[in-house]
Amino acid sequence: MQLDVLIPTYNRQEMLKLTLASLLAAEVPQGLSVRVTVVDNNSKDETRQVVEERKEAFDGRLDYLFEGQQGKSAALNAGIAATSGDLVGIIDDDEEVDAHWYARVHEAFSRGDVDFIGGPYVPRWGAERPPWFPMSYTGVIGWVDGGDQVVAYDKDFPGILMGGNCVITRETLRKVGTFATRYGRTDKHLLACEDEDMYRRLLSSGARGLYLPDLIIYHYVPPERLTRRYFRRWCFWRGVSLGMIDREHRAERVAYLAGVPRWLYGAAARGLFRRVAGALGREKDPAQSFAGELAAWDLAGFFYGRHFYRNGRSAGTGGD
């Protein structure tokens, strides 16, 4: 069984060192062959040197790949094209894998009844969690907890397969296509939803996926992401991305108003009421008050993405 681990990276040489150290330290079970590819997405720091200095420690199982087209999706697609293992694993450059990560991958795919897997993201805080942090918006900082049971990824799963801790068979990727480059973060915008788009295609194809609570990665949360400004920007641009997806794949059995699901208006209205109540001192929980404001940013982003935003990036192969 051959696993290719892809790490798309952009100007994070210090965190990349920790990511690579965790992969090197993790136990590789018998029967699993691992190769790691760092995809440098136009970094201006010493990313290449970091990789080159660690090749000997990886005993020839570490590769450097440069991808000049900006965006995580483009970097991932380059990594997929440059590798050939029957499994494609993806982690981010601000993460560390658990010591048993490889073992969990091997166990899952040895059964032969699964096409993709994902797992939890345990936060490693770079600063104290602020009192206004809303637990309904943990996705902003990449905090994922799908519970302590193995469950199927399907229409009833309360989330999606996140692209910073997942493994997909290469055969499945051949069927559903690679990542759509019109979505995903770049150096200019906090666009998102490359994961939502891929997850939608995986489910539509009939691929079988499992959430594994012990397929763990540890995700660093820097202080600059624990600000209200970052939360507002993230929610707006994620809304833009969801609006773009909806423009192409309108949801079924959902009531719309002015091209936007009606429930978004309701959520924003209730949220703004809580925000005003908080400003007047009637809402004592700062997290609830701020969550109310973020619901309005969700709506604003979705409306803009659905009707106005054109990012000008190529569509990529995914889903076209």
Predicted regions and their residues:
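Non-catalytic, C-terminal membrane-associated alpha-helical segments of glycosyltransferases
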Residues: 233-237, 250-320
